[in-house]
UniProtKB/Swiss-Prot annotation:
The gene is rplA. Part of the 50S ribosomal subunit. Keywords: Repressor, Ribonucleoprotein, Ribosomal protein, RNA-binding, rRNA-binding, Translation regulation, tRNA-binding. InterPro entries: Ribosom_uL1_bac-type, Ribosomal_uL1, Ribosomal_uL1-like, Ribosomal_uL1/biogenesis, Ribosomal_uL1_3-a/b-sand, Ribosomal_uL1_CS. It comes from Yersinia pestis. This is Large ribosomal subunit protein uL1. Belongs to the universal ribosomal protein uL1 family.
Length: 234
């Protein structure tokens, strides 16, 4: 049997895996247990009452968190003409067409988000095997294929998170950093829950938001008592 590290023993002793924690209590506990030498992210897992095997019950989208994610995001944009200029003015680090595609084909991918105007998809389409496996392929469902590339760049910079359920019907994303104030983490979580509720498939039956858990990058998951979340109750 693998030997528990000191950190794992502390987590085991502090976290009650049978309990659903009030959001403020959960955040305080995560902050206490976040002892890594870097500022850990606060990640969320939301178990949805969907059948992920059915395409009409898959949940996918994007939302801008009110307090951002705490990450500095580098944005690449495929656009030309006025759209290219607008993307640059909005703060995109990389803007281009075939020249940008050539960089990516060479393995030069110093960016976190890729946005494309619809007329640029003829170029982006060649990059599916490179961008797809990395979760970077632009998609209209999450607002990264859009005629308004400037707005998409601003959203990405402002702390937009993209979400998509896995094969078990669970959404995994981040809601900030462990050094955020508790109120900001709570409001970010509630904003995500509102977005997920709006994205509820019409064919999903029964309880939709089944379970919410928070964790830090290096920490254990803490189940959240949903009754303390305004977005769930209302």
């Amino acid at each position: 049997m693998a030997k528990l590290t000191k950190r794992m023993r502390v987590i085991r002793d502090k976290v009650d895996v049978t309990k659903q924690y009030d959001i403020n209590e959960a955040v305080a506990l995560l902050k206490e247990l976040a002892t890594a030498k870097f500022v850990e992210s606060v990640d969320v897992a939301v178990n949805l009452g969907i059948d992920a095997r059915k395409s009409d019950q898959n949940v996918r989208g994007a939302t801008v968190l009110p307090h951002g994610t705490g990450r500095s995001v580098r944005v690449a944009v495929f656009a030309q003409g006025a759209n290219a200029e607008a993307a640059k003015e909005a703060g995109a680090e990389l803007v281009g067409m075939d020249d940008l595609a050539d960089q990516i084909k060479k393995g030069e991918m110093n960016f976190d988000v890729v946005i494309a105007s619809p007329d640029a998809m003829r170029v982006v389409g060649q990059l599916g095997q490179i961008l797809g496996p990395r979760g970077l392929m632009p998609n209209p469902k999450v607002g990264t294929v859009t005629p308004n590339v400037a707005e998409a760049v601003k959203n990405a910079k402002a702390g937009q998170v993209r979400y998509r359920n896995d094969k078990n019907g669970i959404i995994h994303t981040t809601i900030g950093k462990v050094d955020f104030d508790s109120d900001k983490l709570k409001e970010n979580l509630e904003s995500l829950v509102v977005a997920l509720k709006k994205a509820k498939p019409a064919t999903a039956k029964g309880i939709y938001i089944k379970k919410i858990s928070l964790s830090t990058t290096m920490g254990a998951g803490v189940a959240i008592d949903q009754s303390g979340l305004t977005a769930v109750v209302n």
